[in-house]
């Protein structure tokens, strides 16, 4: 990947206060979610790749082997995560370029003389930027862990530092002397963006089939923001606002398990990313969401294309903890002899290959578009979720449980019995145990959607991949005591080279600090 200055800012020539330019800036934001970097690697396909990376860094989603996973395996193995490697470079560069697309939109609208339509566009730009910065803040904020001190190699304490804030109004001189924001500074910045988004996005009359955020999404982003800030009363309040305002309901069993439309139908979500046959990601055939997440195609990096291809699996112990009466268990291939084995819905044309090649615990959650397993021009022209209303139910339940575990328990039981498992009961009562149970059910719900990373890091939960009978392959069997050191992502070296305020203030390299677990 060619090194690109991550804190580029829009030039005055890019910003023109006209309806046509505002429209082009508006649609550039969802378009940039699916951007391929032509650098020889097959992981850089935009926002969806970052979702996948975050889940690979948890203890929930694993690649079955490292046969064809060279493009993503180092995030799972905690290798080469320092500032000089392409892996840290991709995430860092992608997000700041997405911010640039947002800043172009924001800078294109003067609120003092804008039309209602342009104010709606501004609201969308602010919401998009808030999503990006909230993701980055939670990925790059240095939090205490079991292996790496917050005192970096230069002797500076980076605890609580996030990333530099780049705005549409920032000049080049300030961008080149722009320090990492503290947690409080970043929180205030994102909250301000979301307050303005809330005010303006009501003027957005068309979300283009959910590729643009609406007011419910702004409420959902506020719920996520307040969870990060541990302002749980506010998080519960805005999660409920998101639920009440959303134009969608929780997905049904049919929605989730249909082999043609399961988790590829953007109409079921509050906000998503939609690819078409014209997207560069789809045109590559293999550098896209479906190729890496679906498991059910003959053309992807995972799936049936080769006899020894890799598959995305759910952690075995996580799978075993899911009740057999919870239909979400059918989003994964059951082991041989299980009563659920015949209930997991496979793509009809692929049943024979699924039986022959797909290992137990493999995901069938993300279906190729139209259930097309053989033509990437159709199957990869799919959608993936950015925000689902189900997440808001779990945020409301967890946030409530921090101060009232009995009420939190009641909320998670209500959601689960109504939408997922009629026999569900939360069998714990203490605050910590109720929170852990709610978060577990949220992890099951959002498996593969890139959100679990944030909860593991925020709540200081351990990641345990090495245990008797584990389905993690050897180099990924890493166990942590509390949040993993690798969840404090490292800024790429170019940021420090070009931004003097960041020089010497990077997070320490967390690579190779854990010992691989070996069965005795």
Listing of model-derived features with the role each one plays in the protein:
Residues 1-53, 301-313, 318-324, 328-333, ...:
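Membrane-proximal, proline-rich intrinsically disordered regions
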Residues 47-51, 140-159, 203-286, 427-429:
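Short, surface-exposed recognition loops and adjoining beta-strand edges that mediate ligand/DNA contacts
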Residues 67-142, 181-184, 198-206, 377-384, ...:
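Conserved, well-structured interaction surfaces
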Residues 187, 232, 405-406:
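TPR-repeat structural position
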